[in-house]
Amino acid sequence: MDNHQLANVIPASEYGRILASGHPIMDVRAPIEFTKGAFPASSNHPLMRDDERQQVGTCYKEHGQDAAIALGHSLVCGAVKQQRVDAWLAYLDAHPDAYLYCFRGGLRSQLTQQWLAEAGRDVPYIQGGYKAMRQYLIDTIDRAPEARPMLILSGITGSGKTDFLLQRQEAVDLEGLAHHRGSSFGRYHEGQPTQINFENSLGVALLKHQQSPARILLLEDESYLIGRSALPKAFYMGMQAASVVILEEPLEARLTRLLDEYVHKMHRGYVERLGEEAGFEAFAEYLANSISGIKKRLGGKQHDELQQMITDALAVQTQRGDTQAHLEWIALLLSKYYDPMYQYQIGKKADRVIFQGDHQAMHQWLDEYATR
């Protein structure tokens, strides 16, 4: 590689800027690598397909680096090579300031850079590649409890914690990153990210937060698991030691909010994805499965009662287009399950609570607290 290419490398000191700014990255790893984990602003344009990468990897183990490189060149040559380069050029036309990387910032990055240079495009590659950048994000997450004081927003189910968080610059929305609302009814239509992608998104969100004027890190009160997304241990332990504020909301407002979240939004989302009939069936299945997921904690009798109430409410919705009947089972679910569970959990944190109030009072208190 010539001196020009050596100079055209983005150093590790730039990781924070690249990730926090959402700078476009052309990821030339194989699709299987990208699927396991990637960064929010990256796009997969592989040098080798999965099968080609596997062949080269086997050759490397059995015959060494030189033989593996030779095999790689024989697999990606001629028309195949031109197709790959054309795909890269199309991406770079749309993202002319993009960087590129492979897993370690090694041979694949260098070869891609060389082929692009031969095609007249000068594209820097990132030192250390995906592996080093991911480690940078893991370190960012682990150091977050010391980077800025954490403050935990708690509140009974339906109190509007997520809506509140989204109005605050001090906040990072963990449930949004996990694509899950953190309860039995918390599933999103599009499903959850892989654990690695959840961690990558969390790391990027924390980098953005640390580069903002915010003096505290406001987080919703979460368990270790948000759906199937696990909070990294050091980060979760920091949350467990942080001060707590409690968001209060009257029962009627909570019921209205949960009717909108559990019924209106979920029904609308399924219908938009699957059509009217299949969408309604998927929505009904979502409600039934959500109750079944907490059957052991509800007890058989309570579970069966709630399932029947849901069935009745769905029948009314089908016949008259009226969703108000759903309020009955939501109210019972709150009184028999969510509210007692919340009281038990918040009782264990009583010594960490430093404020409680409604949405307006909480905003006013935070405005003052965040500038201390």
Curated annotation (Swiss-Prot):
Q: What is its EC number?
A: 2.9.1.3
Q: Which reaction does it catalyse?
A: 5-methylaminomethyl-2-thiouridine(34) in tRNA + selenophosphate + (2E)-geranyl diphosphate + H2O + H(+) = 5-methylaminomethyl-2-selenouridine(34) in tRNA + (2E)-thiogeraniol + phosphate + diphosphate; 5-methylaminomethyl-2-thiouridine(34) in tRNA + (2E)-geranyl diphosphate = 5-methylaminomethyl-S-(2E)-geranyl-thiouridine(34) in tRNA + diphosphate; 5-methylaminomethyl-S-(2E)-geranyl-thiouridine(34) in tRNA + selenophosphate + H(+) = 5-methylaminomethyl-2-(Se-phospho)selenouridine(34) in tRNA + (2E)-thiogeraniol; 5-methylaminomethyl-2-(Se-phospho)selenouridine(34) in tRNA + H2O = 5-methylaminomethyl-2-selenouridine(34) in tRNA + phosphate
Q: Which residues form the Rhodanese domain?
A: 19-142
Q: Which Gene3D superfamilies match?
A: Rhodanese-like domain
GO terms for molecular function, please? Answer: transferase activity, transferring alkyl or aryl (other than methyl) groups; tRNA 2-selenouridine synthase activity
Q: Which residues form the active site?
A: C102 (s-selanylcysteine intermediate)
For this UniProt record, give its keywords in alphabetical order, as a comma-separated list: Selenium, Transferase
The kind of enzyme this is, by top-level EC class, is transferase
PROSITE patterns per record: RHODANESE_3
Functional description taken from the UniProt entry: Involved in the post-transcriptional modification of the uridine at the wobble position (U34) of tRNA(Lys), tRNA(Glu) and tRNA(Gln). Catalyzes the conversion of 2-thiouridine (S2U-RNA) to 2-selenouridine (Se2U-RNA). Acts in a two-step process involving geranylation of 2-thiouridine (S2U) to S-geranyl-2-thiouridine (geS2U) and subsequent selenation of the latter derivative to 2-selenouridine (Se2U) in the tRNA chain.
Q: How does it assemble?
A: Monomer.
User: HAMAP family annotated for this entry?
Assistant: tRNA_sel_U_synth
UniProt protein name: tRNA 2-selenouridine synthase
Instruction: State the organism named in the record.
Output: Shewanella loihica (strain ATCC BAA-1088 / PV-4)
